Amino acid sequence: MATVNQLVRKPRARKVAKSNVPALEACPQKRGVCTRVYTTTPRKPNSALRKVCRVRLTNGFEVTSYIGGEGHNLQEHSVILIRGGRVKDLPGVRYHTVRGALDCSGVKDRKQARSKYGVKRPKA
């Protein structure tokens, strides 16, 4: 335990919080260009072909972003928007692609949770 005198001379150091999404640089979203679109397999015990893409961001970072929803129209050189949010069973994937923004289309025939997949309200 430090004495009062020691604390007067040198106050306690504050802990610095480390960001989970460093490439966003404290922004809500960032724009980038797909450099590679591919599928990868999740960690045990899950099994699937998860759709992901490598993205070169406007700030120079290159990150891996998950493409949520069923089906997508992304290919190399597509301009997309990414947001934070990791995918628990894909190591190294800390970002999500925003569906329905820029070159990334919304999910076709989506009826529920539409706002998460960039789908407009269907005609009644």
From Swiss-Prot:
Function summary: With S4 and S5 plays an important role in translational accuracy. Interacts with and stabilizes bases of the 16S rRNA that are involved in tRNA selection in the A site and with the mRNA backbone. Located at the interface of the 30S and 50S subunits, it traverses the body of the 30S subunit contacting proteins on the other side and probably holding the rRNA structure together. The combined cluster of proteins S8, S12 and S17 appears to hold together the shoulder and platform of the 30S subunit.
A GO molecular-function descriptor: rRNA binding
Summary of subunit composition and partner proteins: Part of the 30S ribosomal subunit. Contacts proteins S8 and S17. May interact with IF1 in the 30S initiation complex.
Similarity field: Belongs to the universal ribosomal protein uS12 family.
Matching NCBIfam families: rpsL_bact
Keyword Ribonucleoprotein among record annotations: yes
Keyword Ligase attributed: no
Protein name (Swiss-Prot/TrEMBL): Small ribosomal subunit protein uS12
PTM-bearing positions, type N6-acetyllysine: K108
3-methylthioaspartic acid: modified positions: D89
GO cellular component terms attached to this protein's record: small ribosomal subunit
Name of encoding gene: rpsL
Pfam families: Ribosom_S12_S23
InterPro entries for this protein: NA-bd_OB-fold, Ribosomal_uS12, Ribosomal_uS12_bac
Keywords: Acetylation, Methylation, Ribonucleoprotein, Ribosomal protein, RNA-binding, rRNA-binding, tRNA-binding
GO biological process, one term: translation
